[in-house]
Curated annotation (Swiss-Prot):
GO cellular component, one term: plasma membrane
Protein name in UniProt: Potassium-transporting ATPase KdpC subunit
Recorded topology in the membrane: Single-pass membrane protein
GO molecular function terms noted in the UniProt entry: ATP binding; P-type potassium transmembrane transporter activity
Complex and partners: The system is composed of three essential subunits: KdpA, KdpB and KdpC.
UniProt keywords, alphabetically: ATP-binding, Cell inner membrane, Cell membrane, Ion transport, Membrane, Nucleotide-binding, Potassium, Potassium transport, Transmembrane, Transmembrane helix, Transport
Localization: Cell inner membrane
Sequence similarity: Belongs to the KdpC family.
Main location: membrane
Membrane-crossing segments per the record: 12-34
Gene: kdpC
InterPro entries cross-referenced by the UniProt entry: KdpC
Annotated organism of origin: Salmonella typhi
Protein function: Part of the high-affinity ATP-driven potassium transport (or Kdp) system, which catalyzes the hydrolysis of ATP coupled with the electrogenic transport of potassium into the cytoplasm. This subunit acts as a catalytic chaperone that increases the ATP-binding affinity of the ATP-hydrolyzing subunit KdpB by the formation of a transient KdpB/KdpC/ATP ternary complex.
Length: 194
């Protein structure tokens, strides 16, 4: 019995430390230093939660920028079903999906003459990505401008305004948050696109 006492004391100490003190401390520090991020990076407009800056949404109307395809099967951008498609690059099913997406994008963007950006045809690893490269957003500008009856230059300026650049070039590439950009388009016109 004497040999079990140190083991039990150590177990109880570690249980309290890792199951109580550490989680409470990290939660408190997160709330103190990074409250917006610790609470889900929620985007508020008109006193309502419109989305998260971390999770994409399904925008299908012509007046909105479209994000990457969602890999969640039943409901696009369902965070409960997060995960990649798990299809290998050599899988014919992936090739068929990409070809179908390219055809749909070409039909929806007849003004675009350049190649369809890769990230508009392939899902991200999580299937919930909300960011595009500035090039992929720029590829959609003519469609969005025409649908909203806005000058192309004004929409391009909005894309440039919502392009997030890393602190240093070796820390990543510039990205455009599609949720924020589409909400800014709505705010610009004071309504939602049809």
């Amino acid at each position: 019995m004497i040999g079990l006492r140190p083991a039990f004391s150590t177990m109880l100490f570690l249980l309290l430390l890792t199951g109580g003190v550490y989680p409470l401390l990290t939660t408190a520090l997160g709330q103190w230093w990074f409250p917006w991020q610790a609470n889900g990076s929620l985007i508020h407009k008109d006193n309502l939660i419109r989305g998260s800056a971390l999770i994409g949404q399904s925008f299908t109307a012509a007046g909105y920028f479209h994000g990457r395809p969602s890999a969640t099967a039943d409901t696009p951008y369902n965070p409960l079903a997060s995960g990649g498609s798990n299809l290998a690059a050599s899988n014919p099913e992936l090739d068929a999906q990409i070809q179908a997406r390219v055809a749909a994008l070409r039909a929806a963007n007849p003004q675009a003459s350049s190649a369809v950006p890769v990230e508009l045809t392939t899902a991200s690893a999580s299937g919930l990505d909300n960011n595009l490269t500035p090039g992929a957003a720029a590829w959609q500008i003519p469609r969005v401008a025409a649908a909203r009856q806005l000058p192309v230059e004004q929409v391009a300026q909005l894309v440039a305004e919502y392009t997030h650049r890393p602190l240093a070039s070796f820390l990543g590439q510039p990205v455009v948050n599609i949720v924020e950009l589409n909400l800014a388009l709505d705010a610009l016109q004071g309504h939602r696109a049809k």
